[in-house]
Amino acid sequence: PKASSVSTRSPKGVTERDATWPQLIDLQAERKLANDERAHLGPLAKGAERDERGERETHAEFVEGRNRTTASRDGASGRELLQRAGLDPNDPRVRQLAHVVNGLHQLPRHRSIHVGGFILTEEPLGSVVPLEPASMPGRTVVQWEKDDLDPVGLVKIDLLGLGMLTVVQDCLLYIRHTRDVTVDLGQLDMSDAAVYDVMCRADTVGVFQIESRAQMNTLPRLKPRCFYDLVVEVALIRPGPIQGEMVHPYLRRRAGLEPITYPHPSVEHVLRRTLGVPLFQEQGMQVAIAAAGFTPGQADQLRRAMGHKRSRERMAAICEELIAGMQRNGIPEETARRIYNQINAFADYGFPESHAASFALIVYATAWLRHYYAPEYLCAILNAQPMGFYSPGTLIEDAKRHGVKVLPIDLTRSVWDHSLELSDGRTLYANDGTVRWGRNREQPTADNRELKTPPPHRDVSVRLGVRLIRGLGSRARRNLEAALQHGPFTSVENAVQRVTLDKASWRCLAEAGAFDSMFAHEPAERRRRAALWEVMAATRGPELPLAPRVKPTAAQQAPLPAYTPLELTEADFRMTGLSLAGHPMAHVRPHLALNGVLTAREAHEIGKDGQPVAVAGLVICRQRPGTAKGFVFLTLEDETGMINIVITPDRFEQHALLISTTPLLLIRGTLQVEQHVVNVRAKQFRALELGGGEQHVKGHNYR
């Protein structure tokens, strides 16, 4: 498929599609377009960059009017409330109470504002529904619940904010300046084998939608080789397919381990593209039309039931009609109920194929940019933080393993945001969607060539920005940015004179190594102490008449104690959450190796199922999905890469506190190897304490 063209700050957006798009993925038009049996048009979604979304919401209110935003609500059943109150459902008095309050079932518990919902009307909305001011100045909310808009035919548009769109736009902007070319996403080779090879290896840290543990475990099994494979990949790891037990059948069929079968010949043409396994909401509609004789309007009612947050009850109401229709078409009741059960799984958030296709486009674009323009991509995703699955430290460690040169924070070169440095000495600074070259540097003129293949290699490094340092607030940012507009700092004293910061902020800068380059005459292990000493002197305050400042001579100066390598790593992690001087695990690797503890890379290379192993690393991710039947999943990171850990429910109950709170773990267990996917099934857990800053790591915990 042909990707759409994107220019910087394009009003069309990254996921804009042309007129051929529905034909490419066989979209079900009834899902959005009105027909005789529909009482509503249905919500329309429009993606926007995260930073641009507020502009678009304001623009929509300015153009369309303040009276076109909508509200949403949460529901709660009466029985659920009784159980929360500790009441016995078998008590006659409680049952009588439940009967009395049954009419309150699913009424709103409280109201909340829909994140990005806008309503379009032909006439002033206030003449149709009641309005009220929102808590945010300048915003107005419709008092109706969003699902109440359908009966009166009001159109709701959702503005969706995606941080990854900001990353893509900024990355394209950086490339245009660092490589002197313009990347046109509409001209990308969507069959680039090198990009698919990367995804098949699950080398996808920082790639949109396919960077999670579950996606990384699926990619080597699915082995995507074309765009539609990515559409399937995006939709596969969702609650609907998982709870409907469709993931493993699809993967087994794709690998040739299970024959491709269909519930009934009448639905073969619907399920052929997903190997006989229903994955998309649109397929549920198409199956109802083909097998049960539903009209497009009836199929849309089914879709609405599948996608509704209270869809189980609505699905039960339509169940008998669906099964009866299939039986009228000669499908046995047992087969009909099996088909219905598969469709019913989508009541738990089956993914629309149209959404999956739009997401898959961003998946491929981000994988392509990361593969061919890793420095620019890293800079863009770091400047877009917080977002995504991994911390800046993990993103940087992964980029370094892929050959990206990352330079430390340096107040003679760094600004607030992360920047790019070229081998010829030029520095590209980025801020809020704009770029500028460093002071007294000549800016190259882009030749605007449309790029279909990567250009000749040019060395580009990422310079970390001051924003990474913990303890600096928005005031520090404003003051630092204003001062750096007039040139870099030349010394600690020069910086203190030009910028107004409190003493704590200056200490943070010194302890993070931001002044190290100003003390090049000192050994590397003493530079931070020298900087801290000078910062304390420069920020001491005005000279007092009875206590004049006396600068000691070189002979009088006492030698400052040196940082050990472990202390440097600890200081880095404490101040920034990462260290370019070395991963904490590297400091204890010789000791661990003597005790048979493997690196993440060694565990992957062994690849022998059932082999006992021991691994250790920083816990960068903890997950306990509701669809995993109590299993807990960890991701450990060491100096060579990452390894995934699987913990059974009983093991987790035994060691829950240790697993949930310890930043550095040594785990013994057995390897699980299936279709090139390597996990460790954990049996024993032990906390490690290095004093190397591991306690300052912020992981992705149970989200």
Specify the residue positions occupied by each region the protein language model found.
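Noncatalytic, beta-rich nucleic-acid-contacting surfaces in large DNA/RNA-processing enzymes
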Residues: 1-703
